[in-house]
Amino acid sequence: ASLTQHADKAIPLLVGSTDEEARLYMVPGGAIDRIAAPAFAGALERAGLAPNAPNVYAQVRPNASPGDMLAALESDSTFRMPAQRYADNRAAVGAPTWNYQFAWQSPGFGGRLGAAHVVDVPYVFNTLASKQASPFLGGQGHQPLADTMFGHWLRFVKTGDPGWARYDLATRPTMRFDTRSAVVADPLADRRQLWAGKKFN
């Protein structure tokens, strides 16, 4: 309740997610390869999205499989869009908010893990060399990205400002963390628009 009532309005906040959160739960055990087209179609129908949703999700990866598309749909419904909506709600009441997306593609699990849930954690804390991070990084990782993310998070902790444009509803400036990180206006807008008006718990 405190989140929706903006009891935290004065507190600066970083809000974001990885691009492909749900792949952590679908790639390592091979579930992503067992998803048939009807399963994705059923999930899409239950979500009640706009008629162009199949075309939007077909673009999430080159030659996207039903499993790829379902992973993207689940990433949006359970992680990305709730975070996005929270950032939107904070921006609407003037709460200091900075939005980010983690886009770096992990080569883990045969190059299929991608920008999955938890892949961003060793980058934020600059712990790429840890034994726990190795399976998710699929190798040594990309140290310049870790330096960049850790630097922004450290600055935020010290100053309350991570060092990129504050989020607003006019241009939706969002830091995209990747091998080349940059602030982008309203990235993945087509997927955000699919979920406009949907409620999240």
Model-derived features: positions:
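Polar low-complexity intrinsically disordered regions enriched in Ser/Thr and small residues
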Residues: D19, G163-R166, F200
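Mature extracytoplasmic/periplasmic domains
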Residues: T159-P187
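Tryptophan-rich aromatic "cage" segments
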Residues: A182-N201
